[in-house]
Amino acid sequence: LTARAYFDGADAAESKLRADITALWEAVEWDFFTKEGTEKVLYWHWSPDKGSAMNMPIQGWNEALIVYVLAASSPTHPIGREVYAEGWARGGAMRNGKSFYDTVLPLGEDYGGPLFWTHYSFLGLNPRGLSDAYADYWEQVCNHTRINYAYCVDNPKGYAGYGADCWGLTPSDIPDGYTASSPTNDRGVIAPTAALSSMPYTPDESMAALRFFYYKLGDKLWSDYGFIDSFDLTSGWFDRGMHIAI
C-alpha cells in the first residue's frame, strides 16, 4: 500500500503496479479470520486442511496492531468495530496504566514486554498522532522503549555490559536456544535490533548503543551483513553467523 501511494505516475508500468496492489488488497478476506464471522476476534492461522485448529487469537497489546488497522480499513472485507474492541483491545483489558522507572505504560504487560512490539506495526504505520479509546500510540511506543532502556541501565540481575550504551531486550537467539527477552524474561542477552530499531523513539540512547556496538564491540558484533542477532557479555557468547533483517 505504501508503494501504491508512492508510484502515482500515469505511465503504464506504474498504473499496472497500482492495479495489481489494489487487487491484492481487496482480495484479502479479513472478516473470514473471525472464524467466518462467528467470533469477535481475529485469528492468526487458517489452512485448507486444518482450518483454524491452531486456535490462536490475535489480542493486544503486542506487535499486531497493524493487522487490525488493515482489517478495519479494508474496502471489501472489513471487520466490525466490536472485533477491534473485544478482540484486539480485549474489552479494555490490554490497558496497563502503571508506572515503571517513573514512566507510565499505557498498554500491555508490566514493564512493556519485548521491544519488537514497538517496531513491527510501525514499519508501515506512523504512531505520531495515532490514538484510540485505549492509548496514544506515540506515548505507548516511546514509554515502552524508555522502560526497557531504564531496566537495562538499572541491571537488577547484574549482567556484564548492561548500561546506558549497551541495552535492548527483544526476541533473539540465546546460548541455549531462543527466547523473547524482556525485563520480565531477562537472560543476559542483548539484541542490537532492540535499541537500533528504537531510534525514532529514543534517538540519543539508541545512538549511544550504536556507537558502542560498532566502535567498542566492533568485529565481534559486526559482519558483512551488519550486526549479528545477539550477544551475552557475561559468558562472552556472540551469535556469529546469525542476522535478522529489521
Predicted features and spans:
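Ser/Thr/Asn(+Pro)-rich, low-complexity disordered segments
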Residues: 1-245
